[in-house]
Amino acid sequence: MKKNYFHLTLLLSLIGISFLSAQDLTVEKMRFLTPHWNGERFEDGRPKVSNDILTRMKKVTIEEAWGVLRNEGYHNQFEGGWQPLHNDMPLVGRALTVQYMPNRPDLADQVIKNGKANGAIGNTNSWPIDRLVEGDIYVADGFGKIVDGTLIGDNLGNAIYANSKNGVVFNASSRDMEGLSDIDGFNAFVRGWH
């Protein structure tokens, strides 16, 4: 369990930033927000942490991680209260991060219109799935909503795993826990289950 919380903490603290909203971040803005990254980047500007590093991070303990994080000035980076799908499976990857505002008809129409104009298909919660690559984790802030805050079930979970070979971290709820549990290699940290 300690390793899982470390991996979640590290994920949320250090690896990649990208927001889905009415506007995506530009490559320039992504570079501005990640100035200390000197390595390769994805087309959208996200840091491309190597798969080798991601594999090695699965073996790092919380104690080791906290030492490094504190020495680098990362204090107060822990967020508790997660409900993992699998307690014994680490979740490590590059974050593709999105934020979902509470639904408002005046904004929702504009966001959907903009997304469709930019080639997005399906509902807004599926748009980031098309951008995932192997090693990514779909990280979504749904403002901790449990009721009316469900972002995925097992159908989208299968699509996420097909693209990323990884899982999700949702500050919101998910459903179809049984179906998601059947996806070999998929893990989720969420605020609640339906």
Task: Please name every model-derived segment.
Residues 60-64, 69-70, 74-194:
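Feature captures the catalytic cores and cofactor-binding loops of soluble hydro-lyases/lyases
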Residues 4, 14, 33, 40-41, ...:
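A generic structural signal for short, solvent-exposed coil/turn residues
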Residues 24-32, 116-123:
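Phosphate-binding glycine-rich loops and adjacent basic patches that engage nucleotide phosphates
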Residues 25, 29-58, 65:
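Amphipathic alpha-helical packing elements
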Residues 1-9:
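Bacterial N-terminal signal peptides that target proteins for export
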Residues 9-18:
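Bacterial N-terminal signal peptides
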Residues 20-22:
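Boundary at the C-terminal end of the N-terminal hydrophobic targeting segment
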